[in-house]
UniProtKB/Swiss-Prot annotation:
Keyword Ion transport applies: yes
Role: Catalytic subunit of the peripheral V1 complex of vacuolar ATPase (V-ATPase). V-ATPase is responsible for acidifying a variety of intracellular compartments in eukaryotic cells.
Protein name: V-type proton ATPase subunit G
Biological source species: Dictyostelium discoideum
Family membership: Belongs to the V-ATPase G subunit family.
Domain of life: Eukaryota
Gene transcribed to yield this protein: atp6v1g
Length: 107
C-alpha cells in the first residue's frame, strides 16, 4: 500500500503543480493584457497632448505668417504706388534734361 500511497501522492503533487502552473500562466496573460491596455491608454493620452500642442503652435505661427504676408503685400503695394507717382511727377524733368544734354555739346 505504501507504493500506491506514494504514487497517489506523486499524482496529487503533479496535479497541484499543473494547477499552479496553469494559474501562473493565466495570471501572466491577465497582467500582459492589463499592461497592453495601460500602454495603449498612455499612448492615446500622449498623442492627444502632442496634437493639442501642435495645433496651438500651428495657429500661433501660421496665423502670424499670414498676417505678416498680408502686411508685406500692403507695404509693397504702397511702395510701388509711391515709385509710380514719383516717376510720373519727374518724367518730364528727366526728358527735358536728356534733350538738353543731347542738344548741348561741349567740346
Amino acid at each position: 500500500m505504501s507504493s500506491e500511497d506514494g504514487i497517489k501522492k506523486l499524482l496529487d503533487a503533479e496535479r497541484t503543480a499543473q494547477k499552479i502552473v496553469a494559474d501562473a500562466r493565466q495570471d501572466r496573460v491577465q497582467k500582459l493584457k492589463k499592461a497592453v491596455e495601460e500602454a495603449e491608454k498612455e499612448i492615446k493620452e500622449f498623442r492627444e497632448k502632442k496634437d493639442k500642442e501642435y495645433k496651438e503652435y500651428e495657429s500661433k505661427y501660421l496665423g502670424a505668417s499670414s498676417e505678416t504676408a498680408s502686411q508685406l503685400a500692403t507695404n509693397a503695394n504702397k511702395e510701388i504706388d509711391t515709385i509710380r507717382n514719383e516717376t510720373a511727377a519727374n518724367k518730364q524733368k528727366v526728358v527735358d534734361l536728356l534733350i538738353k544734354y543731347a542738344i548741348t555739346c561741349d567740346n
